Amino acid sequence: MNKPLIPFNHLNPFNHVNLFNFLNHFNHHKSMSKKVKYTILLFIMAIANFPALANDFVTVSQDGDFILRDKPYKYAGTNFWYGAILGSKGEGGDRERLSAELDSLQAIGIDNLRILAGGDGNHSIPSHIEPTLQTEPGVYNQDILEGLDYLIAELEKRDMRAVIYLNNAWEWSGGYGTYLEWTGHGEAPLPLRDGYENYMKYVSKFITDDKAKELYANHVRNMVTRVNSITGKPYSESPAIMSWQIANEPRCFDPANKEAFYNWLVDTGNLIKSLDPNHLVSTGSEGMWGCEGDIDLWARIHNSDAIDYANIHIWPYNWNWVKPESLAEDLPQAITNTKDYISSHRALTKKPLVLEEFGFPRENMEIAKGSSTASRDAYYEYVLNLMVNSNDLNGINFWGWGGNANPAHKTWQPGDPYTGDPAQEDQGLNSVFSSDRSTVD
């Protein structure tokens, strides 16, 4: 549900819904002359179009805290990769569902969403999401662009925040592989078809390919400098954006590329800052797991002035901390490993640290809605309590929100509802649905 109207003397109270209601009441005020009404109306509309105040943006304090409206900001959030698609009026769009999902999230205290700006490349590639945003270098699907505009406008209404990632090391949204295809490296392997080793060998070329990186830099320029077609405001002035993120789980995929990887992340961070001084910049890193096991490289990247805060991801099942047949029995070890992974990274930076991806399977690796989430619930509870009761974490985003979706197939097919699981994953595998009451209550 929407938050109550903010008092007039604190920030800008006139979001679209409240402004409409106010003007409707104002227009029927009979004791006021038309001239006075007109003057006040002009004043109100001017205020409504003021840029966001400086303290509407999330910043970082010298003490290593997020700050929002002059107060420390810690958050519990989720991953909502498909938000821009839902906001579209075209293929895949469902604005009614988007509004319902945002309201549901806000009602359970989730005010921070990590979202994909949009996918890259052509349609009809197995395990790729559809529709994509960037169909060719610098050529955009206007429906998805306007879907992102709509999503940002809806977040502004609800005083929610988004972390928007602009690239992906993995195949499901195009990312590295698509940029390499566009620069003459041949067809990108698909991990589920051709094996992860072949995929990683192929995409390791992105970090050292100047043409591919420049195509991506142009995409950054196009997105960060965009003007929202709904609000009329540049993205750089939207308080709904907490951070621009360089990529989802960026990796160099080859120890020989570590220095080039560092330089690319720093250069991209500086590029974003030159285009948008209002918003934070983050990497989207998994931590040492995404730096070829080199935690010092992770620290060097995140302590750079080009990066405002630090990211890590944790996947107990993917990282073989738990086995499918013994999730409950392996849970204590997963919690111990989680604590150690967080602590080892926390010790190497004074900047805010966000665990922006973590997931845990349902019992017996079930994917059906209604199946038990007992071990997942216990793991989530541990992570949430750690964030709330310690200084180890400044924010968390679980993966991912499935909300009201009813998966139609185990493997996603065009026309199926979007869940927290992208097209390369079993639908329901890591999704938290609205019906998972033991998780969301």
Tell where the protein language model's regions lie, with residue ranges.
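Bacterial N-terminal signal peptides that target proteins for export
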Residues: 29-40
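Active-site mouth of glycoside hydrolases
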Residues: 57-322, 328-352, 358-439
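Bacterial N-terminal signal peptides
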Residues: 40-49
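Intrinsically disordered, low-complexity repeat/linker tracts enriched for polar/charged residues
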Residues: 4-28
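Residue-level micro-sites within transmembrane alpha helices that shape
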Residues: 36, 48, 247-248
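Boundary at the C-terminal end of the N-terminal hydrophobic targeting segment
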Residues: 52-54
